Curated annotation (Swiss-Prot):
Its cofactor is Zn(2+). PROSITE patterns: DIHYDROOROTASE_2. The modification N6-carboxylysine is found at K139. Substrate binds at H59, L60, R61, N91, H280, A290, G291. Zn(2+) 2 binds at K139, H168, H208. Catalyzes the reversible cyclization of carbamoyl aspartate to dihydroorotate. Pfam families: Amidohydro_1 (PF01979). It catalyses: (S)-dihydroorotate + H2O = N-carbamoyl-L-aspartate + H(+). The lineage of its organism: Archaea, Methanobacteriati, Methanobacteriota, Thermococci, Thermococcales. One of its GO terms (molecular function) is dihydroorotase activity. This is Dihydroorotase.
Amino acid sequence: MHELVLSGRFVLNGEIVGGSIGIDNGLITEISRRDIKGEEVIAFKSEIILPGLIDTHVHLRDFEQKEKETVESGTKAALHGGITAVFDMPNTKPPIMDVKTFEKRLSILEKHAYSDYAASFLLAGNCGEASRARADFYKIFMGASTGGIFSENFESDYSCAPGIVSVHAEDPETIRENPERPPEAEIRAIKKALTAAEKLRKPLNVCHVSTVGGIEAIIKKNLPWVSFEVTPHHLFLTSKDFERNPLLKVYPPLRSEEHRKALWENFSRIPIIASDHAPHTIEDKEAGAAGIPGLETEVALLLDAANRGLITVFDIVEKMHDNPVRFFGIKGRDFSLGNEATFTIIDPKKEWKVKPEEFYTKAKWSPWEGKKLKGKVVMTVIRGMVVMEGDEIIEEPKGVRLDVQGGNH
């Protein structure tokens, strides 16, 4: 008899099957298409059990920006949105660019994270410090973004990174000439990054690709050690939305319908969907800060798209679990015997309205405020613990650091 059994429908080998998952000591100990016995059984009917979804691009702020977000509020938001692990970004205040700051960040994450996490390090001419930090991944900004620090020599910083690099690709010269950050800023930077990647053959993850030229350049090169992310806001919003609502300022900016359409036309080729959750106070947003909160809406937006026939549940699993696990080499997260019992449970037909005042993030606004969505996260389970149920966080902060090995390329 298992300690816990989840019974109902779940995604297994590319299909939705009925059955049961046995869990003991936080690990998956049985996967069966029949009913199995447990000391506690949670039986689902209309819901579907997904492997625990992962967001590879999250700004948890904290440090000197606790008014914007903290590790606690951000990782609670993650669980609420069905995200079981977040990749914490390093352009904090102060930035995570030396071993002392990195270790301070680890201490905060260890004490206050409700979700699991990967810890990052910001690279900008500080290779010596990077080699001592032992981060899970390394971030390079090719052009200035929130925080203002960017790499003066991308190839040098990328070359010295001790692990996988995630890159914010916008060309600084183009931005200086045109602060509105036209598509060419992204396309030039992506092509430069790809040239370095082809030469160095080191794993590279290109963040928030938003343009026709950007996505086409990556697909054309087809380098096995290069992955890329697309955000829900670039999939679902355009520059016309920004014209109506200045709070939608984000880097890279929302694009024209032509670019949004290209992302959808290439949707099957997109490896990773990530939120780029970037919370600010409403005062900072009104003063021009760039960034959109997304942890508590990204999965629901994709479920709503699935209900409209644009994508499938399998796409969500592929782009928010399978590919992040494979590319970053996250150990213990595959849905198989002996691995962690970590799940995102969705009700694919549940209708609800986006109410930012009920969010756990400190950013109490959303581009989708008041929007009715079909499909909702109803429970989040980490290592056999129900940590979120029915919009309520019901566990203490028990998040742990992911075991990121660097991936298979």
